[in-house]
Curated annotation (Swiss-Prot):
Its main location: cytoplasm. It catalyses: (S)-2,3,4,5-tetrahydrodipicolinate + NAD(+) + H2O = (2S,4S)-4-hydroxy-2,3,4,5-tetrahydrodipicolinate + NADH + H(+); (S)-2,3,4,5-tetrahydrodipicolinate + NADP(+) + H2O = (2S,4S)-4-hydroxy-2,3,4,5-tetrahydrodipicolinate + NADPH + H(+). NAD(+) binds at G12, A13, S14, G15, R16, M17, G94, T95, T96, A118, S119, N120, F121. Pathway: Amino-acid biosynthesis; L-lysine biosynthesis via DAP pathway; (S)-tetrahydrodipicolinate from L-aspartate: step 4/4. Keywords: Amino-acid biosynthesis, Cytoplasm, Diaminopimelate biosynthesis, Lysine biosynthesis, NAD, NADP, Oxidoreductase. Catalyzes the conversion of 4-hydroxy-tetrahydrodipicolinate (HTPA) to tetrahydrodipicolinate. Belongs to the DapB family. This is 4-hydroxy-tetrahydrodipicolinate reductase. GO terms for cellular component: cytosol. Signal peptide: none annotated. (S)-2,3,4,5-tetrahydrodipicolinate binds at H151, G160, T161. GO terms for molecular function: 4-hydroxy-tetrahydrodipicolinate reductase; NAD binding; NADP binding; oxidoreductase activity, acting on CH or CH2 groups, NAD or NADP as acceptor. It is found in: Cytoplasm.
């Protein structure tokens, strides 16, 4: 039986994540179709490998799509969210640095469309998030430490993923402490350590290729199709 491809709009198509999304989606033309690629500035070419490109200022005129994948900048987030709500399309967003007002807008939009916002779209990290929460619940009174390591060009510390894992630990009743390391070209490593008297548990995730984040975002887009409106976590989509 023929399956209609999921129509995607890639917002932030000129960035590193946007380029990875375009490349990986092109490997699955039977299930994924890039309806539009949106860049911050006017594109040098209007059509590349059959994909229509638009400037962010032209976003309202983008063709029909089922799900938008947004890895852009906070200033481009509002019009993307508004367009998804207007068209009843799902939204997968990994845009960082959004304000509290923008987070409130996300929560309001979740009443009308299915969406997921995450600091990390690795499926392994999604599983780690659940394991951390469960461990914190089971190990009341144990010390909880989160150590994150990244390449030397990463400026923010602790990383957004470390803070997300810390929130999972807090939901389980732990009080996490953070440490950060910047060295070489480390893509990303997150260690969550629970220490009791005479014993220690270490939960760790190591990323060796940035494509895992784009693959996770494409997985999330597929999983949002046909879902009821709501705000989902990546780990929810694994159920």
């Amino acid at each position: 039986m023929n399956q209609t491809p999921l129509r995607l709009l890639i917002h932030g198509a000129s960035g590193r994540m946007g380029q990875a999304l375009l490349r990986l989606a092109a490997e699955h033309p039977e299930t994924l179709q890039i309806a539009a690629a949106v860049t911050g500035r006017a594109p040098a070419q209007r059509v590349v490998d059959g994909v229509p490109f638009f400037a962010a200022s032209e976003l309202p005129g983008a063709p029909a799509f089922d799900v938008a994948i947004d890895f852009s900048l906070p200033e481009g987030f509002d019009p993307m969210l508004a367009l998804c709500v207007e068209r009843g399309a799902g939204l997968v967003s990994g845009t960082t640095g959004i304000s509290s007002t923008q987070r409130q807008a996300l929560e309001a939009a979740a009443a009308r469309i299915p969406l997921v916002w995450a600091s990390n779209f690795s499926l392994g990290v999604a599983v780690l998030d659940e394991l951390v929460e469960r461990a914190a619940q089971a190990l009341a009174g144990w010390d909880c430490d989160i150590v994150e390591s990244h390449h030397t060009q990463k400026k923010d510390a602790p990383s957004g993923t470390a803070l997300t894992l810390g929130a999972a630990a807090q939901r389980g009743g732990a009080e996490p402490h953070y440490a950060s390391l910047r060295a070489g070209d480390i893509v990303g490593e997150h260690l969550v350590q629970f220490t009791g008297l005479g014993e220690r548990i270490e939960l760790v995730h190591r990323a060796t290729n940035r494509d895992i984040f784009a693959r996770g975002a494409l997985f999330a887009a597929r999983q949002l199709q046909g879902r009821a409106p709501g705000s989902y976590r990546v780990r929810d989509l694994l159920q």
